[in-house]
Amino acid sequence: MAHFNQNFLDSIERDLPSHLSMEDFIAYSNKPLRLSIRVNTLKISHDNFIDLMTPKGWHFEPIPWCKDGFWVTLTQEIQLGNTIEHLQGLFYIQEASSMLPPTALFEPLEVAVAAENTEDDGSDDFSNKIVLDMASAPGSKTTQIAALMKNQGLLIANEYSASRVKVLHANVARMGVANCALTHFDARVFGEYMFETFDSILLDAPCSGEGTIRKDPDALKNWDNNDDKGIVETQKALIESAFLALKVGGSLVYSTCALSRQENQDVCHHLKSLYGDAVEFGSLATLFPQADKACTEEGFLHVWPQIYDSEGFFVAKIYKTSAVERQLPEPRKQKNFPFTLAKPKQVEELAQYFRDSFSISLPDNAQVMVRDLEFWLFPSPVIPLIGKMRYQRIGIKLADALKKGYKVRHEAVLALSSPTRFELSDEQAKEFLMGRDISLLEKGKPQGEVIVSYASNPLGVAKHLGNKLKNNLPRDLVKDKIALYSHN
């Protein structure tokens, strides 16, 4: 049962809209959260995912604000994080409310307009777009944005906490994200370093976390309104930085899992008080059916737990309608960038290796880069931004050059689609993810490097030796335990 501090309840009573009741707020805050997941459409369509998981006892209820999000009920207890489908990046375990900010960032109207302005089916809508996720870890929203962008354009994912950058990268790699650059900064620097650079920005701001009580009953046990004052000042500084980094005509989504006006509406109004008519609040009342139930007078979404039976959340859409003055002179460019553009001959040889070995075509909308004997694939829009700030990691590592030929990297196999794979059974996939070699019943001619897959989606690379598949899974990805569904 949730532990409520009386000061917190008094604060909620002040901010709760008149059409909602405290009784419902307390009742829903004490209910366990429904399990929710998001299908990773970089790897599988949600229809195919439903077809794959329904025989395994999954029941799906669509989440109205995310076309790839579902509340799920399972007919058997299983550690979802240890299932093969999770480890190969077919889905992300993500709270339903947290799927709202990326949806608001690329609401259907804007995607439709982008599609109308292209000659094809709109699949390249984002090819020249530059997007920033200011506070990214652990990566649920980052990977959702990447999927909405169809791995096109450039997504800069920033994380201030050094320990969380590693987790962020692991999730980005698992989900097959190829258009991402990771940075590790206090996000207050973006307004200075990347002034008017981004088409879209998500600021999922650090907050008091009041909306997460259904996940953590002790979250508000020691709640103190005075603790929020420092957080609010940080939030104001971050939203100012985000607005400065936004292009004219661009859109910013500000979100928190806090419930108070102080951390939400007041922060947005602070921005408007600074920049006046350059700040335009966009209405999210029609973002999805019944969005108006959570809509404020400004058009923000203030999601209370009882409205959609979810975590509490706040989402605001803000447009930059005119230029604003730069606060500081442009910083000097960073030097000593360790990568260089690959030469045309190097690119062709590498592309030939991927075609011949795995039937993989390297994407046209990316740039092959070289560092020592390593070959990387960078999203093309990052090239003009090199030197503006330091990057922890850009794009994906494709392969290492050997004395003869190349050695493909695991993350390249997960991010680049290939029709030619060596399909594994449940038990074989389990063995592979536990780092073991796979014995083959029928001996054949050695085939060298092969992509092994499960449910037609890649798991990694093995070396086909004729009588077995030698496991090439990176050691840090080897698992002690894999959860398999029992067959009824």
UniProtKB/Swiss-Prot annotation:
It comes from the Bacteria. GO terms for molecular function: RNA binding; rRNA (cytosine-C5-)-methyltransferase activity. The keyword Mitochondrion does not apply. Transmembrane segments: none annotated. S-adenosyl-L-methionine binds at residues 135-141, 159, 186, 204. The active site is at residue 257. It is an enzyme of class 2 (transferase). Keywords: Cytoplasm, Methyltransferase, RNA-binding, rRNA processing, S-adenosyl-L-methionine, Transferase. It catalyses: cytidine(1407) in 16S rRNA + S-adenosyl-L-methionine = 5-methylcytidine(1407) in 16S rRNA + S-adenosyl-L-homocysteine + H(+). This is Ribosomal RNA small subunit methyltransferase F. It comes from Shewanella pealeana (strain ATCC 700345 / ANG-SQ1).
